[in-house]
Amino acid sequence: MSKPSDRINLTNQFLIAMPNMADPTFSGTVVYLCDHSERGALGLVINRPTDIDLESLFNRIDLKLDIEPLLHIPVYFGGPVQTERGFVLHEPVEGANYNSSMSVEGGLEMTTSKDVLEAVATGTGPKRFLLTLGHAGWGAGQLEEEISRNGWLTVAADPRIVFDTPAEERFEAALGLLGVSSSMLSGEAGHA
């Protein structure tokens, strides 16, 4: 068992699925890790838009959204856990105190309470955000095991990829942070 000081902390990192990813749910994905500790990990897939947009989701939860540029922003598949629950990854809003927010080491926040969506609907919420349904979760040691089996690459997250890069370009953009492209990846791990 490793000592706490020996553990790596992957909070505020991207997980980039390797070509040999066994779980098709995560094939080709980039996951933003919101929390990683000895108890496990929680992240949001940032490159799987659904066919649901903000307007239709807000209608479902009885919120009126009249801000034209926001109406057709896609809602993302955040992962296979709690798929009926919304998770908002966003930049902090000065003076805002949402009911259920978690500050992510590195400057972003993840909020799961409806009040952040109410603020978005009135134009007082975060300007840069990504809304997912569901999240990805790993039990204690599970993510570390997947990484050791060459299932994921990790790299420090860049908010510009989360918020400014088109969804279909996020996988390559995240790989670019490592100086590689998908054409350079192999599903085979080498061990010396």
Swiss-Prot record:
Q: Which InterPro entries match?
A: AlgH-like (IPR003774)
Return the GO cellular component terms, semicolon-separated. Answer: cytosol
| Any matching Pfam family | DUF179
Database matches in Gene3D superfamilies: VC0467-like
Q: Which family does it belong to?
A: Belongs to the UPF0301 (AlgH) family.
Q: What is this protein called?
A: UPF0301 protein BamMC406_0754
Protein source organism: Burkholderia ambifaria (strain MC40-6)
